[in-house]
Amino acid sequence: MIPQPKSIIRGNGFVHVTEPEPASFIDASLPREGYVLDVGSSEDGVVRVTGGSSEGIFYGVQTFRQLLPPKSLRHSGSASEGPWQVPVQRITDAPRFAWRGVMLDVARHFMPLPDLLRFIDLAAFHKLNVLHLHLTDDQGWRLPVDKWPHLTEVACWRKRTMLGAVHHDKYEERPHGGFYSKQDLQEVVSFAAKRHITVVPEIDMPGHMQAAIAAYPELGNGARVDVMEAWGISTHVLNLSDKTLGFCRDVLDAAHDIFPGQYIGIGGDECPHDEWKASPDVQARMKRLGLPNESSLHGWFVGQMADHLRSLGRRAYGWDEILAGGERTPADILIAAWRGIEPTKIAAQRGFEVVACPDVAAYLDFRQSEDKDEPTPVGTVLTVNDVYAFEPVPAGLTEDERKKVIGAQANVWTEHMESARRVDYMTYPRLCAFAEVAWGKSPDESSIENFNDRLKIHTARLDALGVNYRQLSGPQPWDARPDALGKPKTKEARIAKQAKFIADLQ
């Protein structure tokens, strides 16, 4: 099973099962997300799951589904019907972390609603409970905002798309885009909630905003731009005028009205300051505010957005660059620590709650091997075993600091994932390994060898669920993208680069 339960006590014999879901009960003395799955070990021989809440029951049912033959996971047909023989056993289980997340970038490549719902369903099957939805970026905008209609008329489409990770003149000469209606996103929220997944929207600001500036040039610093067609980080950022701050608040209001969860992402990452340094208006604002430099202005902006979300009864969630704001960084902001391992430690030591999602362990756009047929290889090699070895809580923290690490998250950046099929390939089976890390490895069965043995069995479940996962033997010839060149790096080079980047946190 994946994730492996904490305790399995096996009995003698088998239970004859005719229904795919057991009887369910709530016992509030259990952990809220914990459960006990009793498969025929009690005197009455009944299969039952007892959870600390409806969440616990749901996770117990997911475990029970893995006790049935993989064919039972198919949607219909005689192969999906019982009866089945299941070994007698008693399983006791509960997660290690409250936040077990996966981030999906739908800005770089738009994912149609049915594919997005399927992505959620697969995450829930693996007991993940947060979908961080990256809705906006330089290359596309997916969130409707009534007061700013051009966002879903102009900002949601780019004229063409760069092929590969190397900057060159090779493009797919076809427009790409789309957006979700309010009804679409409400369906996403409802669908996820039934599977005990909270959707956390992210609207990246004040950088990663070229698509919005293409739709409303007055938000920028004077340059006339189109929605970005190449990959990378745009130097075109928001200008931080009063009108632009109002735009940002309107966008957060729109997210608040659709997504009921506690957190709303504001990004805060990778914001070049070139335009701010050259802008008389921005420099005048800095002077009025008494701020010494552009980094301080960035921190002030983050504080403005966090204050607005707090007024709505929500908490801001952002990338670890936000920590560079120092004392200006709002104490209640949740940090997504991505630039290597160190930012998780820094955030916790400074008293911030933090979600560990370091690129070197949890970025699923990174290539899966050195094989020449890996599609558009970027980043360092990140194998299934590398993901499984990830420890979200860094060494060297006190007990109180360790508690600040509320969970872990895998990030699926889609610059080079043009379809749901490609997302499957890059996500699975590595997300299976990550799910077990986030749920908490069983002390008795947490070895790489044990996990790999279970993963070989688990691939039959992925087959039944229709997942286009990367084969354990390696990429197949049809997985290659010779038309879309990658930009691979060694792990040493990546770590060195991140060490340079996080100098702003020291």
Residue positions per predicted region:
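Residue-level preference for long, well-ordered alpha-helices that form the structural scaffold
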Residues: 112, 177, 181, 240, ...
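Flexible, acidic glycine-rich loops studded with aromatic residues
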Residues: 315-323, 328-333, 337-506
